[in-house]
């Protein structure tokens, strides 16, 4: 079903993947983070849209 076209192409792709040591970016600007108060407590408001 899946046939490998070239072993050199496969080796190049594997080397490209092996060079990526970082994985996923740990700094995501869109990610929501809970802010804690001085006592270490956090709160969130859950809103259900109509």
Curated annotation (Swiss-Prot):
Q: Which residues cross the membrane?
A: none
**Gene Ontology terms: biological process:** DNA recombination; DNA repair; DNA replication
Query: In Gene Ontology terms, what is one molecular function of this protein?
Result: DNA binding
Keyword Zinc assigned: yes
Question: What is this protein's function per UniProt?
Answer: Binds preferentially to single-stranded DNA and therefore, destabilizes double-stranded DNA. It is involved in DNA replication, repair and recombination. Binds ss-DNA as the replication fork advances and stimulates the replisome processivity and accuracy.
Extra notes? Interacts with the polymerase and the uvsX and uvsY proteins.
What is this protein's record name? Single-stranded DNA-binding protein
Q: What is the lineage of its organism?
A: Viruses, Duplodnaviria, Heunggongvirae, Uroviricota, Caudoviricetes
């Amino acid at each position: 079903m899946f046939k490998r076209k070239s072993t050199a192409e496969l080796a190049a792709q594997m080397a490209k993947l092996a060079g990526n040591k970082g994985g996923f970016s740990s700094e995501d600007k869109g990610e929501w983070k809970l802010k804690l108060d001085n006592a270490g407590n956090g709160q969130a408001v859950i809103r259900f849209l109509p």
